[in-house]
Amino acid sequence: MKRLLCLLLLTTLTGCGSFLIQNPNLQENEVTSATTNVDAVEGDKEEDTGIIDTLRGRSEPISGDPAWAPIHPKEKPEHYAAATGSLFNVDHAQDMYDDTKPRGLGDIVTVMLAENTKAAKSADAELSKKNDSSMDPLQVGGQELQVGGQYNFSYELSNDNKFTGNTSANQSNSLSGSITVEVIEVLSNGNLLIRGEKWLTLNTGDEYIRLSGTIRPDDIAFDNTIASTRISNARIQYSGTGDQQDMQEPGFLARFFNVAL
């Protein structure tokens, strides 16, 4: 029996030791975990660690976030030509029938925000159930059958259940304004991925607008604007930071008890 226990203990220690020893053949890129992608609006989307992140609250965005840095397209090599003395420059020439709509990486376009959504929902429920049951006293030979001279064989039951419930929800959102964004990618079908942000510094904090999505060049108007309703997979965020925003969020204890419930 002792030999068996010693053998099991030795096997366990050997397995733990082999688990702690890293394989020298592993490459560094195989050991390092992949970085998380950056969301188009919210910023870093790391996995939550549980109640700690819930109590900590939502992380505030910052101005100058690298995920929202402007795109700088690569410079095109200059075309060196012999000086002819003419004021005409081929590099800066534009076709008479060509438009100036954004079509390339780094081009800018103004988005006209015109969001207006309304939602209403109501539901009513009513349930009722009623049961009645009775039996007359039993008679034998014309006489009422009794037990002990006091109780007869009769009963009467009645049951009435009712349930009534109703609920209603109303929500409306409206957002108007404008924000200028830039093209960060040109898809193979010609559609453009856009992204941009605008920060406004106020007395007690900052307000910001962030927008991202996919647009068609054909939907861009002649004045280089496009309606927000023409954006596919639109992500629009309008919020703020600072004291005014902090006062609108529940405190530490309120978040704690909400999690507990």
Curated annotation (Swiss-Prot):
Molecular function in Gene Ontology: cytoskeletal motor activity
InterPro entries, per database record: Flag_Lring
Subcellular locations according to the entry: Cell outer membrane; Bacterial flagellum basal body
Gene Ontology annotations of biological process type: bacterial-type flagellum-dependent cell motility
UniProt keyword annotations, A-Z: Bacterial flagellum, Cell outer membrane, Lipoprotein, Membrane, Palmitate, Signal
Residue positions of covalent lipid attachment, annotated as S-diacylglycerol cysteine: 16
Bias-annotated ranges (Basic and acidic residues): 121-133
Any Gene Ontology CC annotation: bacterial-type flagellum basal body, distal rod, L ring
NCBIfam families, per database record: PRK00249.1-2
Similarity annotation: Belongs to the FlgH family.
Subunit structure of this chain's protein: The basal body constitutes a major portion of the flagellar organelle and consists of four rings (L,P,S, and M) mounted on a central rod.
HAMAP family: FlgH
UniProt protein name: Flagellar L-ring protein
Organism: Aliivibrio salmonicida (strain LFI1238)
